[in-house]
Amino acid sequence: MKKRRFVFLSIVLVTIMMFPVVLTAEEENTEDKEDQSNDNIPSHVLDISKENTYPNTKKDQTYLEPNDLANELIESSKVKIENPEFIKMLNESSLKPSKLAFGYRGEIYLGHWPLNYKSDESSMNWEYQEINVNVLNNLGGKEKKTLNYVQEKEKRVKGGLTSKTERAEDVKKMIQMKAQSSTDLPLAFETVIGAGTKKDQTYGVSPKNVGYLHAYAPALNEKGVVTYGEVYLILKGSKKKLEVRNVTKQGIGAWIPIQDHASFSFQLKSN
């Protein structure tokens, strides 16, 4: 009886000791998956910024810091305000109500604005748009030949919103700012690959085959919700605040190309 009890306790003890190890392994695997989904660039996607014959303009999306007045008004709103154009307007405004303005009341309509963007889903399409095809015919050849990427024509790749919306440029800026905060890849709604851009990587084309090297521009796909509202400046004596009325939400999506990057796909065909 004592022997059975000892065996049982030993099994329980071993199980308890192993259990945390299993949990740790699962947590590590989860972290690995998260790392893979964040800027995990496949080996067939290459940075062509140094080789690109067209100098793309780097338009860094920086957060516009509100000044003291703008910050005070933004914090007074019950609806989050992140639109950089609206913040810029507040920064350029001045408001100094008199401290002696007892009983004074007023409201100023500032317009109908997209106020913030909430991202629900973000995914990468490494073959968003084909930009070039290089072909090497070795059907009659007797030796292996090599093929490499050379951009034959200038290619302009544009992204954009997936549906119409009010103040589309403001919405694009908010979406790009939100997307850029979660990736180190250079995002831009437009990128250009210049003619003559090339990479040194070679692809072998054996005899009696035709080699096809396809090049694509990658892009990030964003899906989320934009919050709109009518913004009023409320003045009451020496106090001031922003009030947002008639709040609406709209589902929106966007494609944002990855600047100065190309994805490659190589195929061999025999005829």
Language-model segment annotations:
Residues E143-Q201, G229, S238-N271:
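Membrane-insertion modules used to breach or fuse lipid bilayers
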Residues E75-F86, E127-L136, K142, L185:
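Short low-complexity stretches enriched in small and charged residues
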Residues M1-F6, T15-K118, S122:
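An N-terminally focused, membrane-permeabilizing/fusogenic/translocator signature enriched
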Residues E190-V231:
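Amphipathic, membrane-active segments
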Residues V79, S93-K96, L136-Y149, S270-N271:
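Exposed regions on extracellular, virion, or secretory-pathway luminal proteins
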Residues W113, Y117-E152:
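A glycine-rich, hydrophobic loop/mini-helix early in the fold
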